[in-house]
């Protein structure tokens, strides 16, 4: 459930967050981008481009998926590692949630509706990047520099780890990640955690990232396009009898927001496809509203 704190608790959390956030920013992983000031999803995508769009870039990617990150973070770990008043933190973590007049206790996790929860989750997940950097640092072999090509890029609880080859990620990197998360009460989803070749592509933050030849391309993922088309369809089909200006007023923010998010990268084909979809939907809507001939007669 989405736990929403009371107004008093929200004010208290905001006060403690003012002191905790600078510490989290100072000690946080360098390439962590979620729930941090002056960082956004595009910064994470840009870092992926920096890492993978080079001549000798890594070609294998571990896509990590954490099972219910906010719901399963260990309270003991948070109480032992978060630099704030332990009594207050314990009360926030253990307060539970009230639904239909019944109290549901919380023995693990941090309420997703809490102002301070994203920072607590970030602190819990910070530390993996330096751990990997120390374990897989550059070596000098046979008068040559040997690179493991291990890089971590994280946005909140979504992350990818690059590697020199599939065996390195499967046999050495993945066990380290599993042990790191286990200490925090978290686990990787075996079904959703995959190792992919860059030429096959992978999805991250709504983008599909894939290499063709020597160039890296980012474009809206198929799932992102499907969700966008479904949302447009729901708006149009749910307002069959509204005025034209009302429908336009409802569609514009959705279209503009989606277009602005995906305007960077190779999005032309996706934009054309979605534009055609919107045209067909609104054309049918207009024909039904104004009792014109069937759309196929146009």
Residue ranges and their predicted role:
Residues 8-13, 49:
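Duplex nucleic acid-engaging cores and interfaces of nucleic-acid transaction enzymes
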Residues 12-20, 120-121:
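Active/ligand-binding-proximal structured segments within catalytic/core domains
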Residues 18-34:
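Charged boundary/loop elements
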Residues 24-28, 60, 101-104, 155-156, ...:
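Short acidic (Asp/Glu) and glycine-rich catalytic loops that position anionic groups and cofactors
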Residues 30-31, 45-201:
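Conserved polymerase palm-domain catalytic core
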Residues 94, 184-249, 254:
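A conserved non-catalytic segment of reverse transcriptases
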Residues 247-289:
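Non-catalytic, peripheral interaction segments enriched in hydrophobic/basic residues
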Residues 290-298:
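Single conserved hydrophobic/aromatic residue that forms the stacking wall/gate
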């Amino acid at each position: 459930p989405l736990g929403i704190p009371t107004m008093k608790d929200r004010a208290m959390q905001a006060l403690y967050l003012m002191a905790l956030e600078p510490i989290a920013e100072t000690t946080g992983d360098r390439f962590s981008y979620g729930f941090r000031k002056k960082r956004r999803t595009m910064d994470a995508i840009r870092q992926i481009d920096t890492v993978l769009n080079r001549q000798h870039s890594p070609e294998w990617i571990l896509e990590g998926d954490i099972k219910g990150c906010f719901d399963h973070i260990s309270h003991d770990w948070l109480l032992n590692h978060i630099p704030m008043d332990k009594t207050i933190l314990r009360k926030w973590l253990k307060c539970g949630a009230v639904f239909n007049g019944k109290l549901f206790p919380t023995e693990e996790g941090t309420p997703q509706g809490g102002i301070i929860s994203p920072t607590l989750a970030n602190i819990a997940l910070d530390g993996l990047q330096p751990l990997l950097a120390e374990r897989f640092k550059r070596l000098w072999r046979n008068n040559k520099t040997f690179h493991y090509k291990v890089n971590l890029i994280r946005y909140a609880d979504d992350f990818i780890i690059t590697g020199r080859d599939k065996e390195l990620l499967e046999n050495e990197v993945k066990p380290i990640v599993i042990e790191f998360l286990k200490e925090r009460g978290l686990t990787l989803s075996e079904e959703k955690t995959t190792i992919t070749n860059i030429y096959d592509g992978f999805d991250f933050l709504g983008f599909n990232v894939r290499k063709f030849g020597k160039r890296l391309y980012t474009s809206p993922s198929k799932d992102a396009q499907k969700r966008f088309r479904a949302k447009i369809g729901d708006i149009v089909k749910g307002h069959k009898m509204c005025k034209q200006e009302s429908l336009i007023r409802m569609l514009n923010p959705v279209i503009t927001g989606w277009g602005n998010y995906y305007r960077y990268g190779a999005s032309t084909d996706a934009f054309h496809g979605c534009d055609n979809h919107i045209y067909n939907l609104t054309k049918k809507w207009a024909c039904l509203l104004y009792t014109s001939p069937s759309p196929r007669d146009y």
